[in-house]
């Protein structure tokens, strides 16, 4: 028999943010680490391409702000979702764990948004 009043789950929203963050962390973050952390210090990347003025101009553009926001927020949601489920799997039950982890992710998302807007 079909339940006439099904309980709606909020889990698809969090799984979507987790999946997007995991994909971003797997594809975009390693490229940024390679460019900024390895190629640039070794001198294998043109030095003026990532000069302070150019990076600041990019960070202040709309596309740059969106990129920075996604670079911070998506892996954050992925990591906190993973921590929430890891603690559940280890039978460590945090009181109101969903509120703790997803609330922290939401608060840090707002803080990041404020920081990105004020650049």
Curated annotation (Swiss-Prot):
Its main location: membrane. GO terms for molecular function: succinate dehydrogenase activity. This is Fumarate reductase subunit D. The chain crosses the membrane at residues 26-46, 55-75, 99-119. It is a multi-pass membrane protein. HAMAP family: Fumarate_red_D. InterPro entries: Fumarate_red_D (IPR003418), SQR/QFR_C/D (IPR034804). Keywords: Cell inner membrane, Cell membrane, Membrane, Transmembrane, Transmembrane helix. It comes from Escherichia coli O139:H28 (strain E24377A / ETEC). GO terms for biological process: fumarate metabolic process. GO terms for cellular component: fumarate reductase complex; plasma membrane. Belongs to the FrdD family. Pfam families: Fumarate_red_D. Two distinct, membrane-bound, FAD-containing enzymes are responsible for the catalysis of fumarate and succinate interconversion; fumarate reductase is used in anaerobic growth, and succinate dehydrogenase is used in aerobic growth. Anchors the catalytic components of the fumarate reductase complex to the cell inner membrane, binds quinones. Part of an enzyme complex containing four subunits: a flavoprotein (FrdA), an iron-sulfur protein (FrdB), and two hydrophobic anchor proteins (FrdC and FrdD). It is found in: Cell inner membrane.
């Amino acid at each position: 028999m079909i339940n006439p009043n099904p309980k709606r789950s909020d889990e698809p929203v969090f799984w979507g943010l987790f999946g997007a963050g995991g994909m971003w962390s797997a594809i975009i973050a390693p490229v940024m680490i390679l460019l900024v952390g390895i190629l640039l210090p070794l001198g294998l990347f043109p030095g003026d391409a990532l000069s302070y003025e150019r990076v600041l101009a990019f960070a202040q553009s709309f596309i740059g702000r969106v990129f920075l926001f996604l670079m911070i927020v998506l892996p954050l949601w992925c990591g906190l979702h993973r921590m929430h489920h890891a603690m559940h799997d280890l039978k460590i039950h945090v009181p109101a764990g969903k509120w703790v982890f997803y609330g922290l992710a939401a608060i840090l998302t707002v803080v990041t948004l404020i920081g990105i807007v004020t650049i």
